[in-house]
Amino acid sequence: WRRYFHDWIDVPNPEAQMLASVMFDLRPIGGNGADLFTALQEETLRLASQSPIFIAHMLSNALKHTPPLGLLRGFATIRSGEHRNHIDLKMNGVVPVIDLARVQALRGRLGLANTRARLKAAEEAGMIAPGEARDLIEAYDLIAMTRLENQARLIKSGRAADNFLAPSDMSDFERAHLRDAFVVVRTMQSAIGHGRAVPG
């Protein structure tokens, strides 16, 4: 396993990034392997944090999924297909925050797997300004809750749960707050992408 992780970090192609991301998001559930996992995680975090190329590739990957923001305070909805006029709350809402938190955890060698915990730890380490960390956590919570509520509505109506929401199904109040949450995510993507997500 150590050799696999070393190879993934040394050659950060898309498949290696995906496999490394799985590793960084793992958490032990107990048993005799917990100590081995901790040692392996510490080593891979050290190696990853010391590899600017690997971090750059992970950051680039984290910025691929952008919030669905359109012009004039609207949403950029899916234009065709089964989910036309919907937004993807997972890939364009929850995933961008998870990816940003993972990158910060790698940069700071933060051995945490939970997104909220990673963001709080990054704030405590001075990697994200306190106000920005709080805003991003609140945005993440709102997007995640909106996703769960939408899935519950789908199930209640006899349909299969998915990650797609039609903004037209929301109230003006709900749309405004969801859009504000997406703006927070986009702003943080820009800040971290340009190395500005630190106090100062």
Predicted features and spans:
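A nucleotide- and high-energy phosphate-metabolite-utilizing enzyme signature
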Residues: 1-200
